[in-house]
């Protein structure tokens, strides 16, 4: 048995950006992992939530958005047009990611909620604009949701991993 994985070993093995296993003490033995940092929350003007929820949070190189809608930031309103909502949603996603230092290239997973099945086609049109390389698109899961407020018919959230080794901070 590899001693790094022994049950009495209180270390955490972390994979570094160079692909090397890095042994860090576990908090159970009083150690502090130097690769971890505290969570940072970011709000984005025009894309705030009514509840005390940030637009995006980041710990180290991991980024997670809250719900991203198709709000038009110039008016603060959701467009009635489905295509406009989808386009604004992806534009807002780009802006929100940027607030935490991420880009669309850093995104590894997107979850999309749609009110009706035919909205998927509009999401797909904007999806290939945001992620044009078919060999480098994030995973995506699309689900139906019928409790949107007002004229909202689409919303997403995303997870991203920033490549710190490449100088993205």
Where are these predicted regions, by residue range?
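Low-acidity, Ser/Thr- and Arg-rich intrinsically disordered low-complexity segments
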Residues: 1-7, 11, 16-17, 24
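N-terminal presequence-like segments and the immediate start of the first folded domain
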Residues: 10-13, 26-91, 95-108, 114-169
């Amino acid at each position: 048995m590899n001693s790094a994985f022994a049950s009495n070993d209180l270390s955490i093995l972390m994979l570094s950006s160079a692909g090397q296993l890095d042994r860090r003490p576990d908090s159970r033995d009083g150690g502090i992992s130097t690769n971890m940092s505290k969570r940072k929350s970011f709000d984005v003007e025009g894309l705030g939530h009514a509840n005390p929820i940030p637009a995006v949070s980041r710990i180290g190189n991991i980024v997670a958005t809250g719900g991203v809608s198709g709000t038009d930031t110039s008016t603060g309103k959701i467009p009635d047009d489905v295509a406009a909502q989808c386009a604004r949603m992806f534009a807002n996603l780009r802006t929100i990611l940027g607030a935490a230092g991420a880009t669309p290239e850093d995104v590894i997973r997107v979850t999309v909620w749609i009110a009706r099945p035919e909205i998927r086609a509009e999401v797909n049109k904007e999806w290939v604009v945001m992620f044009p390389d078919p060999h480098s698109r994030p995973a995506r899961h699309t689900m139906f949701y019928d409790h949107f407020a007002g004229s909202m018919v689409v919303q997403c959230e995303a997870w991203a991993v920033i490549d710190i080794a490449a100088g993205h901070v």
